[in-house]
Swiss-Prot record:
Belongs to the LOR family. It comes from the Eukaryota. This is Protein LURP-one-related 6. InterPro entries: LOR, LOR_sf, Tubby-like_C.
Length: 191
């Protein structure tokens, strides 16, 4: 898989990452991602920290912004059968660069599909979310049907779960998608 955000976050081997939700009361919500050595890899902040509804930021372990993700609004969006989220990274000059678009079907009688689809770049590169995120039982699958990442339940805890990423998968992209799923389902990044 080609890097979506940065090749710095691609690994040559499968990795298991641990996600810990932060309480809204103490840290404004969001979550922290650690590796198997319990070293922080990513931090995700939502509106509890940012103060803006429908906006998320994925940061690296040093606090540098990697992805700005926001929910599209406006009249056209209100008439659409999908909620649309856009993820932006920053180029070397600090300008935002579009990275992905996630389409989440609105709950209505007009919705034909319940699949969450992520489009990356120009062309036909897309991913689907299969399964149900709130149950910690879902996968991100590429257009060929290959699982690139899996969200799995951590036994005994609702606030901790694990994410398994396959080799050469951009983990920053994966956790950008997971941040949106967290928000969509009203969890730690939502208001």
């Amino acid at each position: 898989m080609k890097a979506v955000v940065s090749k710095l976050y691609c690994s040559s081997m499968e990795e298991v990452m641990v996600v810990r939700r932060r309480p809204h009361v103490v840290n404004g919500g969001g979550f922290v991602v650690t590796d198997y050595k319990e070293k922080i890899v990513f931090k995700i902040d939502g509106c509890g920290v940012l103060g803006t509804k429908g906006e998320l930021v994925l940061r690296d372990s040093d606090g540098n912004d990697l992805l700005l993700i926001h929910k599209k609004g406006g009249v056209v969006q209100a008439l659409s059968i999908h909620n649309k989220w856009k993820g932006y990274s920053y180029d070397y000059q600090g300008s935002p660069k579009p990275v992905f678009t996630l389409r989440d079907p609105k709950h209505s009688c007009f919705s034909i599909t319940s699949s969450i689809r992520i489009s990356v770049g120009p062309g036909n590169c897309y991913f689907d979310v299969k399964g149900y995120f709130p149950d910690r039982d879902c996968s991100i699958v590429d257009s060929k049907g290959n699982v690139i990442a899996q969200v799995k339940e951590w036994i005994g805890s609702r606030d901790i779960y694990k994410v398994v990423t396959k080799p050469s998968v951009d983990k920053a992209f994966v956790f950008g998608v997971i941040a949106v799923l967290d928000y969509i389902y009203g969890e730690s990044t939502s208001c």
